[in-house]
Structures are given as structure tokens and as C-alpha cells.
């Protein structure tokens, strides 16, 4: 097994293990984060009825304007700020953070801190 597929399998195992414990509700949805090499995606999920409350990613024009590259910490900060603004518009201030098996470092940390700075608490 190559080191890349082993790393992905380890992340998926962490994801399953944590997902058993973390559930989002209507009052406190789950902030789910996914990152690829070029983009980062974040969404607020209500697990009780399986719906997405709000979402933001570097694919949105409001986030990607003014960015040279969408796969860095600066882009992650803009995604976190945009998601926090959408959540506060729907009167959601408390969330459960789900890092989706990724390490809390780099882009994941930048997104989380930007969301906290813009009004979300977790």
C-alpha cells in the first residue's frame, strides 16, 4: 500500500470514529470541513433531518475574488468568514466542529479561527 493511500485510509478511519460521537442539531449544527489540493469546502449540517443549513467554499465568487490561489490558508480564512456570516444571518451562533479526519493544522485551523472571529462559537 502506498503512503498516500495509507494516509487517506487513516483519515477515513478517524472520520468514521469521530462521526459516531458528533451529531448536529437544528440549534447546534455540525460544521463539516473538506479540503482538496485546490479548494476548501465548509457546510453546516443538521443531522436530525439530514439537511445542509449553510455552506461556503472557494468555488463561490464572493470568496475567490481577489485570491491568486484557492488552496491556501488565506482562502480558508475567507471561507470561514463567509460561512460565519451566513450562519449568523440564519441566527445560528453555536456549532459543533467536525474536522472530517483532517489534522487541526494549517487550512483547517485557519478556517476554524476565522469562523470564531466572525461570531461562531465552538
Swiss-Prot record:
The keyword RNA-binding applies. InterPro entries: Ribosomal_uL18_bac-type, Ribosomal_uL18_bac/euk. CDD domains: Ribosomal_L18_L5e. Keywords: Ribonucleoprotein, Ribosomal protein, RNA-binding, rRNA-binding. GO terms for molecular function: 5S rRNA binding; structural constituent of ribosome. Belongs to the universal ribosomal protein uL18 family. This is one of the proteins that bind and probably mediate the attachment of the 5S RNA into the large ribosomal subunit, where it forms part of the central protuberance. NCBIfam families: L18_bact (TIGR00060). This is Large ribosomal subunit protein uL18. The lineage of its organism: Bacteria, Pseudomonadati, Thermodesulfobacteriota, Desulfuromonadia, Geobacterales.
Amino acid at each position: 500500500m502506498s503512503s498516500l493511500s495509507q494516509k487517506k485510509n487513516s483519515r477515513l478511519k478517524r472520520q468514521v470514529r469521530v462521526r459516531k460521537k458528533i451529531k448536529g442539531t437544528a440549534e447546534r449544527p455540525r460544521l463539516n470541513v473538506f479540503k482538496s489540493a485546490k479548494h476548501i469546502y465548509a457546510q453546516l449540517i443538521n443531522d436530525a433531518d439530514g439537511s445542509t443549513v449553510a455552506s461556503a467554499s472557494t468555488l463561490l465568487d464572493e470568496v475567490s475574488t481577489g485570491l491568486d490561489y484557492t488552496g491556501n490558508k488565506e482562502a480558508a480564512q475567507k471561507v470561514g468568514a463567509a460561512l460565519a456570516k451566513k450562519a449568523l444571518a440564519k441566527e445560528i451562533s453555536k456549532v459543533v466542529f467536525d474536522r472530517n479526519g483532517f489534522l487541526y493544522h494549517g487550512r483547517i485551523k485557519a478556517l476554524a479561527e476565522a469562523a470564531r472571529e466572525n461570531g461562531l462559537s465552538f
